């Protein structure tokens, strides 16, 4: 062996070890994210990204996954500009490889659409979510749960758009929700977290049209599922509890409203969800005045 051969072998081994370390950090970040420990998750993802960047490691799949995972954290922290930037970087990498993974590209499109939805840019949200749906319909059977995810998100887009823009109509949303829920109940079952999302979405659809009893009926189904399968302090449990409190307040059932809002407040405070906590505390004040 020449010195050059030994150096090359050393560098290859070094990069392999660093690549493995970045992968481990990324997986640890995912574990923290699933436990709603977003700051710890972001720390792990940042460590993974730094290893990739500093050492110029060429692994498009891993790099795009890290950017995507960071985007998930930022959207959960309501930092939408950073979420969008990371999702776009993941998309660019996934589209640029020699043999693009259409499934992963669809995920990027879906995630970008979700950021636009949260930013209330509904036309952009619909565009990106429909792009994701088109790809998924090409590569999956019609009753795949991933198809239901796209259908439900497009329903959400139309619901939010109709709430804020008179050029959209609530009826545009319902066919997407109904088909999405049908697929999820058939393939995932009644107690799956994605089925809970369908019930929450349909509940919101009713709420925005002033159909509060129907909203509560769907919200309660969602809450029942989440209490069964999620940790007690999960952000999604807080979210549906807030929505229930809001709906009960609309029909002047103050005791029920306060019960659910207090649960939401407790969870949001533990997760440092400042904006959500402010909204919950505002509704609690309304309960006190009623």
PLM segments and residue spans:
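Helix N-cap/loop-to-helix boundary motif
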Residues: 11-19, 56-64, 81, 98-106, ...
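Conserved alpha-helical positions within TPR/SEL1-like repeat arrays
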Residues: 19-34, 61-76, 103-118, 145-160, ...
